[in-house]
Amino acid sequence: SQLDYHDCHEAFDKKLKQYKKHGYLIPNHKMIKNEKQIEAIKRAAVVNNGLLDYIEEHIQIGMTTQDIDDMAVAYTSSHGGYSADLNYEGYPKSICTSVNDEVCHGIPGDYVLQDGDIINVDATTGVNGYFADASRMFMLGHVSEEAQRLVKVTKECLEEGMKAVKPWESTIADIGTAIEKHAHANGYSVVEEFCGHGIGKAMHEDPYVYHYTPKEKTVLIVPGMVFTIEPMINQGTRHIHLGTDNDWTVYTDDGKLSAQWEHTLLV
């Protein structure tokens, strides 16, 4: 009933205030989604995850990255969704396809997928004004053991970050600490320039989700928050640069491999 909802809401706000008194940085109301918003985000996530499943079934050596983008457009539109990436701040395509030493924002084009490549496909899908965001790594043909290990450890970094999410107990910083610890233990570095983010009615919302231990205080994690965790893990140096071919694609400074896995998470 409306009364139960009001009581529940009031108790939640009271609990937040208590945590604030104890020195915690608490999330604002925009960061906490209601049931209706959560259901809408879930609908977008079903299409977005379905798209990545579809790509997993069809991606192959000899295909261009543009072919993957074409697949994404066809799948998303036929399932009642649309790409949030297309025309976002002028981005020209519907997904990002980042190959080998490309860290993120690889633009689909005429690059032909080769035996031994690793590729990240990152998709953000909108359905009725709500969004979900995820990315996966795909390995093509005979991939080196070093590349396989990077892909595996990067996925584990995402999983460690997710395990650190404990409502009313952990803060956003705990996610970054868990990711960084696992990456460093395996001899890898964490890209610091790009982070996860809140998501819902916009593709990028607060909070900013670090993949390393930040210096500043971060918000308490509470039920109803929806955000992405999307670590980019490098084989060599963490340092990166924008390529000269476009205003989007980012590369590792040393030309070594980079990998990323991403989930949208509901607390």
What are these regions, as identified by a protein language model?
Residues S1-K20:
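Short Cys/His-based metal-binding microdomains
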Residues H22-V267:
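Active-site neighborhoods and metal-handling regions in enzymes and metal-associated proteins
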